[in-house]
Amino acid sequence: MKNEHNKNLDRRDFLKVLGGAAAVTSATLLPGCKNKQESAYTATTDIPTDQMTYRINPSTQDRVSLLGYGCMRWPTVSNNSARDSNDDIDQETVNKLVDVAIAHGVNYFDTSPAYCKGRSERATGIALNRYPRDKYFIATKLSNFAPSTWSREASIAMYHNSFKELQVNYIDYLLLHGVGMGNGLQEFNARYIDNGVLDFLLAERQAGRIRNLGFSYHGDIK
């Protein structure tokens, strides 16, 4: 696909290019710990571990949990949210939260280079790397919101860093983050089209380093 064609993508063409695998990001569906005595992971014995609902991804046949775990607000050592606090992430608690999620059938974890002030991918990767790679699905994003990250080089560097932080050699679901935000189509083109980044990601998908390529959307549906 040539960049010249990309500049004229409409919504239908865009969805076709992504192969119908446009993904919706999960909310943070399991709570962080309120305090050391009232931890989310103490509920392990109270919740059935065999009643998760799954959906089959028609493109890959992945059996994905209907409930996903959003990793935007990992807890800190001071029991705050790492989204708002610069305190260290409480990795021990993150590990236990992930353990509870997996024990109860959750296998889809959604993160981003932007979450937790840039620390979510690393904490998520540490927690998940304790499990066999085929036991979970990682969704992360190309979160190149700032104009300083719009160049091809900066965007690709962000993409490669996600592999390092997550400790993986492929990403299950890679999302173009927050399309529709900012200055609409003009900003979208600057982030993904004019710089050739979408073409690069399509090649990465072809090579198997991205299993599903999609986007998250926070704008007006019209």
What are these regions (language model features)?
Residues 78, 149-222:
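Glycine/proline-rich, positively charged
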Residues 71-89:
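Acidic/histidine-rich helix-loop elements
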Residues 30-68, 81:
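C-terminal segment of N-terminal export signals and the immediately downstream linker at the start
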Residues 57, 69, 109, 124, ...:
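Conserved, mostly hydrophobic/aromatic
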Residues 9-30:
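N-terminal export leaders
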Residues 111-127, 185:
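Glycine-rich, proline-tolerant flexible connector loops at the mouths of alpha/beta enzymes
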Residues 58-61, 125-133, 164-167:
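Acidic (Asp/Glu)-rich catalytic clusters
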Residues 1-10:
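N-terminal secretory signal peptides
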